Amino acid sequence: NVDTVRENIKKQYPNLKISNIQKTEMPGLYSANLDQQIIYLGEDGQHMFVGSMIRLKDQKNLTKDLVLGQNSIDWKQLPLKDAIKTVKGNGQHVLAVFSDPNCPYCKQLEPELDKLKDVTIYTFIYPLKPQSIVVSRQVWCAPNQSYSWKKLIEQGVKPTVASCTNPIDRNLELGKKLGFNGTPTLIFANGFKLVGARSAEEIQAVWKELGL
């Protein structure tokens, strides 16, 4: 059972950070999470493999369901009014991004987002770094939020000092509530979540795979 697998792993490999152990449809095989990746384990804790489990009778990818289930949030939890909205083309694809202006991976992501077509991007400014808080508020209070954000994160150009009522504290509370411990965090329209910088091709592949 699940407890047996957990104890065997803990006893033999105490430094292995495995979580969310579950039974699968295949007797003696268990799914789990390791570094945000779905893995499979034998009950004795001696074997582990990574890959897709396919149910042959209907060709259903059971691993895909696990990935979605364990890496998703409810899109309706996102207060879109607290994000900077950028629309490109017809805006049919939708993406939310939690981003810190001083995060190097967020800076890597921005040029990739620029390559996307027909997309609506909601940028939640999420200053995990203390030095990012003031400038995050200034971006929100700028006359053109989207332009100011791009200038800051891509070129390091800080906006003119401004103050106004802003959602930065709410964004921090929301991110912590949702368990967002790193940036950038990307959320797709069905709630599927990815952490870290991704290429435009990777984002487009997710849209295609999930029918978004």
Task: Outline where the language-model segments fall.
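Short strand-coil-strand connectors
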Residues: 35, 189-190
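Short secondary-structure capping/turn micro-motifs that flank functional sites
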Residues: 130, 191-192
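Short, solvent-exposed loop/turn motifs
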Residues: 38, 192-193
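Short, exposed beta-strand-loop hairpins at the edges of beta-sheets
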Residues: 195-197
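Short, hinge-like loop/turn segments at secondary-structure boundaries
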Residues: 138-142
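Conserved, helical-rich catalytic subdomain that frames metal- and/or nucleotide-binding sites
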Residues: 143-150
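Extracytoplasmic thiol/disulfide redox context detector
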Residues: 1-137, 151-154, 158-183, 199-212
